[in-house]
Amino acid sequence: MANSNPKLLVTQNPFSVFLLTFLLLITNVKSDSFSFNFPKFDTDTKSIIIDGDANTTNGVLQLTKKDQLGNPSPHSFGLSFFLGAIHLSDKQSGKVADFTTEFSFVVNPKGSQLHGDGFTFFIASLDYEFPEKSSDGGFLGLFDKESAFNTSQNSIVAVEFDSFRNEWDPQIAGNSPHIGIDINTIRSSATALWPIDRVPEGSIGKAHISYNPASKKLTALVTYLNGPVIEETAVSYTVDFAAILPEYVLVGFSGATGELAETHDILSWSFTSNL
């Protein structure tokens, strides 16, 4: 079992690709079995990079900006990821890691019936170029208008928690929020309804995301406890990680608001992989 222990690294400007790649390579996860667990986030949290509007406050990782009253700010985007290059696959042996990640989160519209835009859990190449601007709104902090649909340019897989339907999103049920699996583009390959509007405002959601290399199945399960009722949804998609992503990757979160806003708070996060 391996782990990495640099201090929390906070930036005000997007990373240089060369600097980021260097930092990640010197903190490579060498072990075939790897895990980390963050029961909360604060300034003493190790091995986490935050960038853009992301911040840590009172043990919570806030992906997008809030005002002094805790209300969400429009046109905000931020990201956070683990400072360590995760060994996802081995070309020589042909092996691909299985992994499981779990996190608890709150997306709160603060009284607004219409809200947006959402957040993602992502797995990306070490040299993935996160946009320096124009990645708010429906681009969810991962893409801009130039990269959002250019599948040959990107090397990223994401599970999106999308609370506002844009023109590229599927019409599952009107403008209902949805979760989706994105492969190198903001246009989801598979989607399912996200029951955020059916639970009380401020409810804690729990996400369980896993990958099975034998079946090449990526699965995301989201659960809310709504009194005696369990609100649950799941989405899965077959994807060959070895064909989409390099041997070493980074894992993390992004979030964004547009004209409409909501909070995007990660309360806890764990990750386990076995190659």
From Swiss-Prot:
PROSITE patterns given in the database record: LECTIN_LEGUME_ALPHA (PS00308), LECTIN_LEGUME_BETA (PS00307)
InterPro entries named among the record's database cross-references: ConA-like_dom_sf, L-lectin, Lectin_LegA_CS, Lectin_legB_Mn/Ca_BS, Legume_lectin_dom, Leguminous_Lectin
Induction (free text): Accumulates in roots during colonization by arbuscular mycorrhizal (AM) fungi (e.g. Glomus intraradices).
Domain of life the protein comes from: Eukaryota
Example GO biological process: response to symbiotic fungus
UniProt key word Glycoprotein: yes
Record's signal peptide: 1-31
GO MF annotation list: carbohydrate binding
Function according to Swiss-Prot or TrEMBL: May be involved in arbuscular mycorrhizal (AM) symbiosis with AM fungi.
Identification of the protein by name: Lectin 8
Organism whose genome encodes this protein: Medicago truncatula (Barrel medic)
